[in-house]
Design a protein with these regions (language model features):
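Multi-pass alpha-helical membrane architecture of UbiA-family
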Residues: 2-518
Length: 518
């Protein structure tokens, strides 16, 4: 009888759509966070008064914790039971509702407890399953302990419904219980049992909340991509083949470039530390993922051009347009999450970067169709990327704080130099009304036909020498190398131009440090 009831419940849950299941996950998580704030020790809506830190806590830190654990369990169950990840998600989205019981139980027992990550691991691991030992003093409430065991039992029941195997059900019970317990103590484990030292205030990620957020966002990002791969391998393989790593590296690297220059300009010494390195990674990922999201968004409107040029557009290989659009939105949302962890001004800078990228691609505005304007837009995006790195120490003044010796030559040089990116798309752009400078000026068949664009690209390096005379040697070398390559190569490679940009950027950074202040 019980087996039939469980089977019927599982079949009913599997009948819902995946979209609705994910919406349930969203609802349960935020309902739990809301109730926890009101009924646990805080007795306050939102845990604290309105602030940047409280926003991170409510909308990033806690949701990322629950979402990461949810997808981790779904991935484990799906892999071990060889059940489709989508089906497991649908059932798990109903069972996740158990998490709202935690504050209800705690409130009924003692009017709420202060829930934190376990302050010490020994009592947490040794006594978690011992009902006679309280763990409230290390931040673990009775409600948490009861519900974690209950959720593990639900997983065991689901396993039995799918396999009719008591031993596998028992194994999944203990495995899921262990995973949840270890996950709950993950930050204390990473801090070598002394979270008060590792998560102390200071550094690029200044508050403990920012540090917690970046850890769980990195974990969530990894699990989200793994989950999507399990949902639809064909889709993810097609999408990953379109990665433009050289451009993602370029934009992410610009944030690091800006951060490095701001250190020199501000007179701050970089402090070596794991969370400072994670802060640098956070800057990089915010722009790298942001660019990837915009690239996917641009693919939605470049199908005709890509068909002619032979570029790898997943929409030409059967990927559904709606799924591709959602993937673009997901990447942009992840990018914004990384940016807001750096600081609030960084999120506004990235928001402007994304909006600019949307206007660049979206008809009827589609700024990429207009000569000069298209590369001016890219130049502004480059400046925003540098400003994001500046925002760590300059906050809302980041753009105004950019030295004119960087701002002006970058605006001019990128406007001219990025004409090279369109050399390989001339036929497709011409056929679809996208008028770029290469469409107007570049003729690959002759030396004289390649000269105008070769000259523009090489001059872009020399512009820096006009504003910063100390870099004239490097500017001449890089400009000459790019000129010769563009003149004598009929089929140019975009990678060459980006490698030259990376090398010149490193050279420019070195020279700016030597001649500081700017």
């Amino acid at each position: 009888v019980y087996h039939r009831i469980i089977d019927k419940s599982v079949c009913s849950a599997e009948a819902i759509s995946l979209k609705r299941a994910l919406f349930f996950v969203f609802c349960w998580i935020f309902l739990r966070i809301f109730i926890e704030g009101v009924l646990e020790a805080h007795h306050s809506i939102g845990f604290a008064s309105f602030s940047y830190k409280s926003l991170l806590t409510y909308f990033l830190h806690f949701p990322l914790f629950y979402a990461s654990l949810f997808f981790l369990l779904v991935i484990i169950i799906s892999a071990l039971l060889k059940e489709p990840a989508g089906k497991v998600t649908k059932v798990a989205s109903i069972g996740l509702g158990a998490i709202i019981l935690v504050p209800l139980i705690d409130w009924s027992i003692g009017h709420g407890f202060m829930i934190t990550y376990p302050l010490r691991l020994e009592p947490y691991f040794m006594n978690f399953l011992n009902p006679f030992v309280s763990l409230v003093h290390i931040g673990v409430s009775p409600g948490q302990r009861v519900v974690i065991v209950f959720i593990s039992l639900l997983i065991a029941f689901y396993t039995y419904a799918k396999t009719s195997d008591y031993f596998r059900a028992l194994g999944l019970f203990f495995l899921s219980l262990g995973v949840i317990i270890i996950f709950g103590g993950l930050t204390t484990l990473l801090a070598a049992n002394h979270p008060e030292r590792i998560f102390a205030t200071g550094g690029i990620l200044y508050t403990d909340t920012q540090k917690y957020c970046v850890l769980y966002l990195l974990l969530f990002s990894t699990l989200a991509f793994l989950y999507l791969f399990m949902l639809d391998r064909g889709f993810m393989r097609s999408v990953c083949k379109t990665l433009r790593l050289e451009r993602m590296t370029f934009y992410g690297g610009l944030a690091i470039f800006g951060f490095g220059i701001s250190l020199v300009y501000k007179g701050v010494r970089f402090q070596v530390g794991s969370f400072n390195y994670l802060g640098i990674m956070t800057m990089f990922l915010s722009l790298a993922l942001g660019y990837w999201g915009l690239q996917v968004f641009n693919d939605l409107f470049d199908v005709g051009t890509d068909r002619m040029t032979g570029r790898n557009n997943p929409l030409l290989k059967g990927v559904k347009r709606e799924n591709y659009r959602r993937f673009s939105m997901m990447l942009m949302a992840l990018a914004l999450c990384y940016a807001v962890i750096i600081n609030f001004p960084a999120s506004l800078i990235l928001y402007a970067y994304l909006l600019l990228g949307i206007l660049y691609s979206l008809p009827p505005v589609r700024l990429k169709r207009i000569p000069i304007v298209s590369t001016v837009v890219i130049a502004v995006a480059v400046i925003l990327s540098i400003a994001l790195g500046f925002s760590v120490y300059y906050g809302g003044q980041a753009i105004n704080a950019l030295p004119a010796k960087i701002l002006l030559p970058t605006l001019l040089a990128v406007t001219l130099g990025f004409t090279a990116k369109d050399i390989g798309h001339i036929d497709g752009d011409k056929a679809h009304g996208v008028i770029t400078l290469p469409v107007l000026l570049y003729k690959p068949g002759t030396f004289s036909g390649r000269l105008p664009i070769a000259g523009l690209v090489s001059v872009s390096y020399l512009i820096y020498a006009f504003f910063i005379p100390q870099v004239i040697t490097g500017a001449v070398l890089f400009g000459t190398g790019t000129l010769l390559y563009t003149l004598f190569t009929k089929r140019t490679s975009e990678l060459f131009y980006f490698v030259m940009l990376y090398l010149f950027g490193a050279y420019l950074f070195y020279m700016l440090i030597r001649i500081s202040p700017l």
